[in-house]
């Protein structure tokens, strides 16, 4: 009993989500064929074969059943990384996160210390006219800067048009290679990315090729989209050791009526709801209303924290990547199958040379492997 209590206490300590990873296992480019990445299949821990490591993403065709609902995140990564010039001609890098008000947008800056309030910036491109920006304020939560853009940049559509002309795809810092930007503009997007607004890819979806999606549909698997614009809440490093009161930065989520109606229908059958990626999990779980004990369509900012102890209302299974140590994504997956089991599976993945992080291999958490739901 004391051991169980100690384990539960460790579930809420950040250091309990750390692990050692050989840097050579960090993928710098994706699999040449999306559905050819390696796949670890996680089953019920009481089964003799509770973990399969000799599979590929294309084997998901054998895992999903006719009538199962597979939910994908259709957000599209914007070219949200901008290089701006100071008065002294030195460059500063901005990562556009979200609109604050009017034409003012919250951006992460590198190096941020150079961007004092009212400092003027210039946005340049060889083929476009110069644009003047100004530092409008400092955000205490993120350490970012509020940047005033031209007066017409007041919505996601107008910002996306500007970013298409001046910006670059914001790859994670651990992806280091000599590929051209055009390579990542395709490879760092899912095949179904149609809704611009993300500053990072929902990477589990990178494993789904057009042919795999087509074959799943032919089998009778239902595939529907939600939207969660991946932002600071997904990739921000956790900076507190005590996770009991953890808060995440808000992100925009949209789950429409068609998806909600399908959730309600599926829950009355023996079919399962499979989320493609942790962002799809958070979007789906956010559409459950505790007030009315039912599922509802939503279109709003959400900062749902899923960690050990969370009881899943919607999701039965998950396709996900292998995530960074001490990340909120590790907490979410631990809530599904338990922290200790997850870390043991990561040890196994490392031993068998699975590739990690955004361009890496995948893990499928099957419905029978989840901890008890309520």
From Swiss-Prot:
Catalysed reactions, semicolon-separated: 7-aminomethyl-7-carbaguanosine(34) in tRNA + S-adenosyl-L-methionine = epoxyqueuosine(34) in tRNA + adenine + L-methionine + 2 H(+)
Cellular compartments annotated: Cytoplasm
Superkingdom field: Bacteria
MF terms (GO), sorted A to Z: S-adenosylmethionine:tRNA ribosyltransferase-isomerase activity
Swiss-Prot/TrEMBL GO biological process terms: queuosine biosynthetic process; tRNA wobble guanine modification
SUPFAM superfamilies: QueA-like
Pathway this chain belongs to: tRNA modification; tRNA-queuosine biosynthesis
Keyword Transferase: yes
Keywords, alphabetical: Cytoplasm, Queuosine biosynthesis, S-adenosyl-L-methionine, Transferase
One GO cellular component term noted in the UniProt record for this chain: cytoplasm
EC number(s) stated in the UniProt entry for this protein: 2.4.99.17
Family: Belongs to the QueA family.
Job description of the protein: Transfers and isomerizes the ribose moiety from AdoMet to the 7-aminomethyl group of 7-deazaguanine (preQ1-tRNA) to give epoxyqueuosine (oQ-tRNA).
HAMAP family: QueA
Protein's recorded name: S-adenosylmethionine:tRNA ribosyltransferase-isomerase
Phylogenetic classification of the source organism: Bacteria, Bacillati, Cyanobacteriota, Cyanophyceae, Synechococcales
